[in-house]
Amino acid sequence: MALRPARCYRTTERRSYTRKEYVRAVPQPKVVHYVMGNSSVEFPVEVQLVSKSDILIRHNALESSRIAGNKYIMGECGRTGYLFNIRVYPHEILRENKMAAGAGADRISDGMRLSFGKAVGTAAKVKKGQEIITIGVNPERFYAAKEALRRCSMKLPTACKIVVTKGKELIKD
């Protein structure tokens, strides 16, 4: 069955559902790496992607955002010239009550009886003002990090802002 649109899951009004021991099978998050680049160096400039609203971000959106941003920053800075860090983890379990459609579906489907649903994915619960992604670079690569975060934000279902949290005085305009 096809993947439902993100609008079905993006609100945070529902109560958190994270208890894996009650769920028969939770799908693994698609996010492969949370820290990329050179983690042994302390970079003088740190730029963060910050959420502007409360939202659930699905694991496949986080993964596509990671790929887009990491690909760009690696091309600009090389393998050891940056530190890329995803700051959220998809703990929330997303459920779907699959409904049969078409001829004879009423005989097969249970409708809303036992409508709890099966786990179809995971999502990260992000609050307004929370950091989603952090990139550490040298001052001369600041604009590359900013562009990488802009590309990351295009893949996420919320409006984001880019904030310099460390080394603002080192950046030359």
UniProtKB/Swiss-Prot annotation:
GO cellular component annotations of the record: ribonucleoprotein complex; ribosome
InterPro entries hit by this protein: Ribosomal_uL16, Ribosomal_uL16_arc, Ribosomal_uL16_CS_euk_arc, Ribosomal_uL16_dom, Ribosomal_uL16_euk_arch, Ribosomal_uL16_sf
Ribosomal protein is among the record's keywords: yes
Molecular function GO terms recorded: structural constituent of ribosome
Lineage top rank: taxon: Archaea
Record-linked Pfam families: Ribosomal_L16
Keywords: Ribonucleoprotein, Ribosomal protein
Example GO BP: translation
NCBIfam families: PRK04199.1-4, uL16_euk_arch
Family of the protein in this entry: Belongs to the universal ribosomal protein uL16 family.
Designated name of the protein: Large ribosomal subunit protein uL16
Species this chain originates from: Methanococcus maripaludis (strain C5 / ATCC BAA-1333)
